[in-house]
């Protein structure tokens, strides 16, 4: 269920991609901060495991400057996105199982050349604040 960006006349600056609607509580934290700061964004629910072709197409065609990937369990989503783009990717581990430690470790243990920034477990708001800081560098 993609949401409309804040202002459809402006370029989408941040793409929020969640692996599942079960991550809603976390990606809504991201949305709130972006809305409060007037940052144009897009929200997609795309699983790296169940919808790899859809994810490929989305990343390939996206004009976003930054990706925020919200994922739990094996949390492959941020790394898969990072492998397909040179744009910054911020991973948000979700505390689905093992308190989110499994997701956190999946996000931070990436191979060389596939960088993913990570915020704390369930800290969607910090991912949004980090994205805003990155965008501020472009001003």
How should each PLM-predicted stretch be described?
Residues 3-7, 18-25, 29, 99-139:
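C-terminal binding/interaction regions
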Residues 11-48:
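Glycine-rich phosphate/diphosphate-binding loop of Rossmann-like nucleotide-binding domains
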Residues 13-20, 66-69, 90, 115-118:
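Short glycine-rich or small-residue beta-strand-to-loop segments that form or flank ligand, phosphate
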Residues 21, 46-48, 72-73, 94-97, ...:
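Short, ordered loop/turn segments at secondary-structure junctions
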Residues 29-36, 83-86, 133-135:
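Short, solvent-exposed amphipathic alpha-helical segments in soluble enzyme
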Residues 39-40, 64, 86-87, 109-116:
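Glycine/charged-rich beta-loop-alpha catalytic/anionic-binding loops adjacent to active sites
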Residues 43-63:
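N-terminal beta-loop-helix "entrance" segment that forms/cooperates
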Residues 56-93:
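Glycine-rich phosphate-binding loop
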